[in-house]
Amino acid sequence: MIGKIKKFNFKSLLILNTFALIATSYLFNNFIFIGVYTLFFFISLFTTKNGIKIIKKLNLLQNIRTEGPANHLKKSDTPTMGGVFMVIPFLIFLLIININLGSLKLFLLLLTIFGFFITGFVDDFLSIKKEQNTGLKTKEKFFLQSIIAIIFIFLAYEKDLINPLITVSDSWQINMNIFTLPISFLVLVGISNSVNLTDGLDGLAAGCSGIVFYGLGTEILMKEQQELIIFSILCYSMSGICLGFLKYNSYPAKIFMGDTGSLSIGAILGSIALLTNSVFTLSIFSGIFIIESLSVMIQVGVFKITKKLFHNGKRIFLMAPLHHHFELKGVKEQKIVENFWKINILLVILGIVLKINL
């Protein structure tokens, strides 16, 4: 049915996601889920709309890399660092909850998200200051992410907050054993960077993130563990935030989230998945993010190998990440984004169906 919809835009996604939240709230007999989603959707609308004015006054505008698709040059001077207006309301909400509950899990989550948020903020700020598309060097950014991730993982593992068993179903669990720490690192840093790589077309990362947060929140609810319900509430609040931001980020974008937003969103997804033992289903829900990231690794890997062997590097894609390949193939930006959204919705449905039937 989704595939037959000719125009699947922001309004279509908003209606579908909201309907799904209403249905979920009804099925689980708890309307706080649709309530928190709706509240943060409107908070995000307000903060983003006013944030655009603030960013323009501060002259915090996007620099576009010249080696990218030519049609992206018109995006230059679009306000960026919009992630500030997505993440700060969420961090305040998380801080208030943690003050009331005094949860170590929530405290670690708060510190980790804040760390990735600062990393993204510094990267965006330096990019604007240097008038380039990149701020921190790749190695510098990865180093900062790694330090934050390692601190989170070791503290969580030390306090038995990370389960070494990846739960596929109630009867099927995979024991990570000695690979618990490296896999946890891969999940946290990998998803964070994957969301960052996906954020290359108007509305792509924000829309997909809103969908994934809904899926993750619902999967956590299906565990039927009272102590985990708060994480579903956090996921639904982020789903609302992403869709509120999407109103101004969908084509033609009036604001970009920047690394401030994308790195933080990935960190929220990865850390919540680790703390709730939802890594398996997150890997399905985040299929778009993972494919985008893999396309870059394949492109770079093949180029380096062929250059070493044949002294002439070959490329698999016209450009990576994958969304740029389709752009250079002549597919319109809006159509690429709409199709990726549709695929992401199907992945969330697949993940939930597997959760029910396995």
From Swiss-Prot:
GO terms for molecular function: metal ion binding; phospho-N-acetylmuramoyl-pentapeptide-transferase activity; UDP-N-acetylmuramoyl-L-alanyl-D-glutamyl-meso-2,6-diaminopimelyl-D-alanyl-D-alanine:undecaprenyl-phosphate transferase activity. Its cofactor is Mg(2+). Keywords: Cell cycle, Cell division, Cell inner membrane, Cell membrane, Cell shape, Cell wall biogenesis/degradation, Magnesium, Membrane, Metal-binding, Peptidoglycan synthesis, Transferase, Transmembrane, Transmembrane helix. Pathway: Cell wall biogenesis; peptidoglycan biosynthesis. One of its GO terms (cellular component) is plasma membrane. It catalyses: UDP-N-acetyl-alpha-D-muramoyl-L-alanyl-gamma-D-glutamyl-meso-2,6-diaminopimeloyl-D-alanyl-D-alanine + di-trans,octa-cis-undecaprenyl phosphate = di-trans,octa-cis-undecaprenyl diphospho-N-acetyl-alpha-D-muramoyl-L-alanyl-D-glutamyl-meso-2,6-diaminopimeloyl-D-alanyl-D-alanine + UMP. It is an enzyme of class 2 (transferase). Pfam families: Glycos_transf_4, MraY_sig1. The chain crosses the membrane at residues 13-35, 81-101, 106-126, 142-162, 171-191, 201-221, 228-248, 268-290, 336-356. PROSITE patterns: MRAY_1, MRAY_2. It is found in: Cell inner membrane. It is a multi-pass membrane protein. One of its GO terms (biological process) is cell wall organization. Its EC number is 2.7.8.13. InterPro entries: Glycosyl_transferase_4, PNAcMuramoyl-5peptid_Trfase, PNAcMuramoyl-5peptid_Trfase_CS. Its main location: membrane. Catalyzes the initial step of the lipid cycle reactions in the biosynthesis of the cell wall peptidoglycan: transfers peptidoglycan precursor phospho-MurNAc-pentapeptide from UDP-MurNAc-pentapeptide onto the lipid carrier undecaprenyl phosphate, yielding undecaprenyl-pyrophosphoryl-MurNAc-pentapeptide, known as lipid I. HAMAP family: MraY (MF_00038). Belongs to the glycosyltransferase 4 family. MraY subfamily. This is Phospho-N-acetylmuramoyl-pentapeptide-transferase. The lineage of its organism: Bacteria, Bacillati, Cyanobacteriota, Cyanophyceae, Synechococcales. The gene is mraY.
